[in-house]
Amino acid sequence: MTNNLIACLIINNLTLIHFVGFEDIKIKNNIMLIKRYAIITITSLLIYSISFYLYKLFAKNNLLFLVPIFYVILIYVLILLFKVLNDLFIVYNKKSNYSNDFMLSNSSLIAITFFALDKNNGFFEGLEILILSALGILIALMSITSIKKNFDKNPKINILENEPIYFFIIFILSLIPNIIILIYNQ
């Protein structure tokens, strides 16, 4: 593992945490969290697989300046697509199965795939970055939910009432599994 990959992992974790919805922290069931992040990881791997070859084509033809434009267009198209799907669910089910946080998290997959699409990385190194980051966030969220359950039992302790503190703790906890894997691989 190179310093470049370590930097990518840190950036990925920061980007993922930026799009972690406050609803994720309120989820008390770890099975629901695992399902949600399994969907997010699989979707990100599909997007990454499609984007990798396009990115390499841009790099080969010295057109990398077009990547941010492509990125922004893709973000807006995905957000619109998820909004339309959400509206369809509301029409047919009278309620939405997917929150705005879920849609934001899915659109953020584009962001993390572009961090994984570093031109110095091979295809499988990028996959490794995505999987490590998603696993780190999932482990962190599961740790947070278990910590929160313990704090909820004692109403006198209100340490985790502040949203920024949650996200800071998630960031620190999400880096721990990645750092352990990096040290083990070296």
UniProtKB/Swiss-Prot annotation:
Subcellular compartments: Cell membrane
Topology within the bilayer: Multi-pass membrane protein
Keyword set, alphabetical order: Cell membrane, Membrane, Transmembrane, Transmembrane helix
GO CC term (a single one): plasma membrane
TM regions (residue ranges): 5-25, 39-59, 62-82, 122-142
Protein name: Uncharacterized protein BB_0073
Organism: Borreliella burgdorferi (strain ATCC 35210 / DSM 4680 / CIP 102532 / B31)
Lineage, top ranks: Bacteria, Pseudomonadati, Spirochaetota, Spirochaetia, Spirochaetales
